[in-house]
Amino acid sequence: YVDGYPGESCFNCVMPGMSEIIVITSGKGGVGKTTTAVNIAASIGYYGYRVLLVDADPQGNATSGFGIQKRTVDRSTYEVLLGQCSARDAILTTPFKGVEVIPSSMALAAAELELADMRDRVMRLKEELVRVKGEYDFVLIDCPPSLGMVTLNALSACDSLIIPIQCEYYALEGLSQLVTTVRQVKRLYNPGIEIEGVLLTMYDGRLNLTL
Protein backbone atom coordinates (compact mmCIF):
# COMPACT_ATOMS: atom_id res chain seq x y z
CA TYR A 1 0.00 0.00 0.00
CA VAL A 2 1.24 3.47 -0.89
CA ASP A 3 -0.78 6.56 0.06
CA GLY A 4 -3.67 4.28 0.86
CA TYR A 5 -3.82 2.61 -2.55
CA PRO A 6 -3.03 -1.09 -3.02
CA GLY A 7 -0.61 -1.92 -5.78
CA GLU A 8 0.94 1.50 -6.39
CA SER A 9 4.30 0.38 -4.98
CA CYS A 10 4.55 -2.22 -7.75
CA PHE A 11 5.31 0.54 -10.27
CA ASN A 12 7.65 2.70 -8.18
CA CYS A 13 10.64 0.70 -9.41
CA VAL A 14 10.42 2.40 -12.82
CA MET A 15 13.13 5.05 -13.03
CA PRO A 16 12.43 8.40 -14.70
CA GLY A 17 13.31 8.23 -18.39
CA MET A 18 13.14 4.43 -18.37
CA SER A 19 10.44 2.37 -20.01
CA GLU A 20 9.58 -1.31 -20.18
CA ILE A 21 7.87 -3.40 -22.83
CA ILE A 22 5.80 -6.20 -21.31
CA VAL A 23 4.06 -8.93 -23.31
CA ILE A 24 0.88 -10.59 -22.05
CA THR A 25 0.68 -14.02 -23.65
CA SER A 26 -0.36 -17.56 -22.89
CA GLY A 27 -0.17 -19.39 -26.21
CA LYS A 28 -3.88 -20.23 -26.05
CA GLY A 29 -7.21 -18.47 -25.76
CA GLY A 30 -9.82 -18.25 -23.04
CA VAL A 31 -7.44 -17.75 -20.11
CA GLY A 32 -8.08 -14.08 -19.37
CA LYS A 33 -5.14 -12.74 -21.39
CA THR A 34 -6.87 -9.68 -22.80
CA THR A 35 -8.68 -9.00 -19.52
CA THR A 36 -5.28 -9.02 -17.81
CA ALA A 37 -3.73 -6.68 -20.38
CA VAL A 38 -6.60 -4.18 -20.27
CA ASN A 39 -6.77 -4.08 -16.48
CA ILE A 40 -3.02 -3.73 -16.01
CA ALA A 41 -2.92 -0.90 -18.55
CA ALA A 42 -5.85 0.93 -16.97
CA SER A 43 -4.44 0.48 -13.46
CA ILE A 44 -0.98 1.76 -14.38
CA GLY A 45 -2.50 4.73 -16.18
CA TYR A 46 -4.64 5.50 -13.13
CA TYR A 47 -1.50 5.90 -11.04
CA GLY A 48 -0.12 8.53 -13.39
CA TYR A 49 2.09 6.47 -15.68
CA ARG A 50 2.12 6.79 -19.46
CA VAL A 51 0.98 3.53 -21.04
CA LEU A 52 0.86 2.31 -24.62
CA LEU A 53 -1.18 -0.84 -25.22
CA VAL A 54 -0.41 -2.64 -28.47
CA ASP A 55 -3.34 -4.84 -29.46
CA ALA A 56 -1.77 -7.67 -31.44
CA ASP A 57 -4.78 -9.98 -31.24
CA PRO A 58 -6.94 -10.06 -34.42
CA GLN A 59 -10.05 -10.35 -32.24
CA GLY A 60 -9.38 -6.79 -31.09
CA ASN A 61 -11.03 -7.10 -27.69
CA ALA A 62 -8.43 -4.89 -26.03
CA THR A 63 -9.16 -2.23 -28.65
CA SER A 64 -12.88 -2.40 -27.88
CA GLY A 65 -12.15 -2.50 -24.16
CA PHE A 66 -10.67 0.98 -24.35
CA GLY A 67 -13.66 2.41 -26.17
CA ILE A 68 -12.30 2.32 -29.72
CA GLN A 69 -14.70 1.23 -32.46
CA LYS A 70 -12.81 -1.29 -34.60
CA ARG A 71 -14.75 -0.39 -37.72
CA THR A 72 -13.35 3.16 -37.54
CA VAL A 73 -9.69 2.05 -37.36
CA ASP A 74 -7.60 3.10 -40.37
CA ARG A 75 -4.16 2.17 -39.05
CA SER A 76 -3.58 -0.82 -36.82
CA THR A 77 -0.94 -3.26 -35.64
CA TYR A 78 -1.34 -4.98 -39.00
CA GLU A 79 -0.16 -1.92 -40.95
CA VAL A 80 2.69 -1.40 -38.48
CA LEU A 81 3.94 -4.98 -38.88
CA LEU A 82 3.79 -4.81 -42.66
CA GLY A 83 5.56 -1.46 -42.81
CA GLN A 84 2.54 0.37 -44.22
CA CYS A 85 2.61 2.95 -41.42
CA SER A 86 4.74 3.81 -38.41
CA ALA A 87 3.82 2.88 -34.86
CA ARG A 88 3.48 6.57 -34.04
CA ASP A 89 0.94 7.11 -36.82
CA ALA A 90 -1.18 4.21 -35.55
CA ILE A 91 -1.46 5.40 -31.94
CA LEU A 92 -4.92 6.44 -30.74
CA THR A 93 -5.93 8.19 -27.54
CA THR A 94 -8.50 6.65 -25.19
CA PRO A 95 -10.92 7.99 -22.56
CA PHE A 96 -8.77 6.30 -19.91
CA LYS A 97 -6.18 8.34 -18.03
CA GLY A 98 -2.64 7.82 -19.29
CA VAL A 99 -3.52 5.08 -21.79
CA GLU A 100 -3.00 5.16 -25.56
CA VAL A 101 -3.55 2.25 -27.94
CA ILE A 102 -2.24 0.85 -31.19
CA PRO A 103 -5.47 -0.87 -32.21
CA SER A 104 -6.05 -4.21 -33.83
CA SER A 105 -8.11 -5.07 -36.89
CA MET A 106 -9.37 -8.26 -38.50
CA ALA A 107 -6.70 -7.82 -41.18
CA LEU A 108 -4.15 -8.84 -38.56
CA ALA A 109 -5.29 -12.45 -38.99
CA ALA A 110 -3.59 -12.44 -42.40
CA ALA A 111 -0.31 -11.12 -41.04
CA GLU A 112 0.99 -14.58 -40.18
CA LEU A 113 1.17 -15.56 -43.85
CA GLU A 114 2.26 -12.17 -45.13
CA LEU A 115 5.13 -11.90 -42.67
CA ALA A 116 6.47 -15.36 -43.51
CA ASP A 117 8.29 -14.23 -46.67
CA MET A 118 9.46 -10.86 -45.37
CA ARG A 119 12.98 -9.89 -44.42
CA ASP A 120 13.52 -9.45 -40.66
CA ARG A 121 10.00 -10.81 -40.20
CA VAL A 122 10.50 -11.48 -36.47
CA MET A 123 11.96 -8.04 -35.67
CA ARG A 124 9.50 -5.75 -37.43
CA LEU A 125 7.48 -4.81 -34.35
CA LYS A 126 10.62 -4.14 -32.32
CA GLU A 127 11.98 -1.82 -35.00
CA GLU A 128 8.83 0.30 -34.72
CA LEU A 129 8.38 0.23 -30.95
CA VAL A 130 11.92 1.43 -30.21
CA ARG A 131 10.93 4.71 -31.91
CA VAL A 132 8.09 5.42 -29.48
CA LYS A 133 9.13 3.45 -26.39
CA GLY A 134 10.77 6.45 -24.73
CA GLU A 135 7.49 8.37 -24.73
CA TYR A 136 5.91 5.88 -22.30
CA ASP A 137 6.65 4.34 -18.93
CA PHE A 138 5.16 1.02 -19.99
CA VAL A 139 4.33 -0.59 -23.32
CA LEU A 140 2.01 -3.59 -23.01
CA ILE A 141 1.43 -6.01 -25.87
CA ASP A 142 -1.70 -8.17 -25.91
CA CYS A 143 -0.82 -11.19 -28.05
CA PRO A 144 -3.01 -13.51 -30.14
CA PRO A 145 -3.88 -16.95 -28.69
CA SER A 146 -1.14 -18.70 -30.65
CA LEU A 147 2.64 -18.89 -30.92
CA GLY A 148 2.83 -17.72 -34.53
CA MET A 149 4.72 -14.93 -36.25
CA VAL A 150 2.86 -12.08 -34.55
CA THR A 151 3.59 -13.46 -31.08
CA LEU A 152 7.23 -14.02 -32.05
CA ASN A 153 7.42 -10.35 -33.04
CA ALA A 154 6.07 -9.37 -29.63
CA LEU A 155 8.48 -11.65 -27.77
CA SER A 156 11.42 -10.33 -29.79
CA ALA A 157 10.46 -6.75 -28.89
CA CYS A 158 9.78 -7.09 -25.17
CA ASP A 159 11.78 -6.83 -21.97
CA SER A 160 9.61 -9.35 -20.13
CA LEU A 161 6.34 -11.25 -20.27
CA ILE A 162 3.47 -12.11 -17.98
CA ILE A 163 1.78 -15.46 -18.56
CA PRO A 164 -1.89 -15.71 -17.54
CA ILE A 165 -2.75 -19.34 -16.95
CA GLN A 166 -6.09 -20.91 -16.17
CA CYS A 167 -6.06 -23.32 -13.25
CA GLU A 168 -6.71 -26.46 -15.28
CA TYR A 169 -4.62 -29.33 -16.64
CA TYR A 170 -4.43 -28.47 -20.33
CA ALA A 171 -3.29 -24.95 -19.54
CA LEU A 172 -0.26 -26.46 -17.81
CA GLU A 173 0.57 -28.37 -20.98
CA GLY A 174 0.45 -25.14 -22.97
CA LEU A 175 2.74 -23.43 -20.48
CA SER A 176 5.53 -25.89 -21.25
CA GLN A 177 5.30 -25.12 -24.97
CA LEU A 178 5.35 -21.37 -24.32
CA VAL A 179 8.41 -21.59 -22.07
CA THR A 180 10.22 -23.56 -24.78
CA THR A 181 9.36 -20.85 -27.32
CA VAL A 182 10.60 -18.11 -24.98
CA ARG A 183 13.91 -19.94 -24.57
CA GLN A 184 14.31 -20.13 -28.35
CA VAL A 185 13.53 -16.42 -28.73
CA LYS A 186 16.03 -15.62 -25.98
CA ARG A 187 18.72 -17.60 -27.78
CA LEU A 188 18.03 -16.35 -31.31
CA TYR A 189 16.48 -12.87 -31.14
CA ASN A 190 16.15 -11.32 -27.70
CA PRO A 191 18.77 -12.29 -25.11
CA GLY A 192 17.32 -9.87 -22.55
CA ILE A 193 13.82 -11.34 -22.39
CA GLU A 194 12.68 -12.54 -18.97
CA ILE A 195 9.52 -14.17 -17.66
CA GLU A 196 8.03 -11.70 -15.18
CA GLY A 197 5.77 -14.36 -13.71
CA VAL A 198 2.76 -16.63 -14.12
CA LEU A 199 -0.63 -15.14 -13.27
CA LEU A 200 -3.28 -17.63 -12.15
CA THR A 201 -6.70 -16.80 -13.59
CA MET A 202 -10.21 -18.22 -13.12
CA TYR A 203 -9.22 -19.44 -9.67
CA ASP A 204 -11.49 -22.03 -8.08
CA GLY A 205 -10.41 -23.16 -4.62
CA ARG A 206 -12.59 -26.28 -4.85
CA LEU A 207 -10.27 -27.83 -7.45
CA ASN A 208 -7.18 -29.80 -6.43
CA LEU A 209 -5.25 -28.49 -9.44
CA THR A 210 -5.84 -24.92 -8.28
CA LEU A 211 -4.15 -25.71 -4.99
Question: For each predicted feature, which ranges?
Answer:
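P-loop NTP-binding core
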Residues: 1-211
